[in-house]
């Protein structure tokens, strides 16, 4: 689902130290 995708993006962003993801 879209929610799962968003959560995955946030996980990757945290690990990479990049916060380009915006709700």
Swiss-Prot record:
GO terms for biological process: lipid catabolic process. Expressed by the venom gland. It comes from the Eukaryota. Binds 1 Ca(2+) ion. It catalyses: a 1,2-diacyl-sn-glycero-3-phosphocholine + H2O = a 1-acyl-sn-glycero-3-phosphocholine + a fatty acid + H(+). Its cofactor is Ca(2+). It is found in: Secreted. Its EC number is 3.1.1.4. Contains 7 disulfide bonds. The subspecies C.h.atricaudatus mentioned in PubMed:20347857 is currently considered invalid. However, since different origins of specimens explain sequence variations, the specimen origins are indicated under strain in the reference section (in PubMed:20347857, South Carolina to C.h.atricaudatus). Belongs to the phospholipase A2 family. Group II subfamily. D49 sub-subfamily. This is Acidic phospholipase A2 CHA-E6b.
């Amino acid at each position: 689902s879209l929610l799962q995708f968003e959560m995955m993006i946030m996980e990757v962003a945290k690990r990479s130290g990049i916060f380009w993801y915006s709700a």
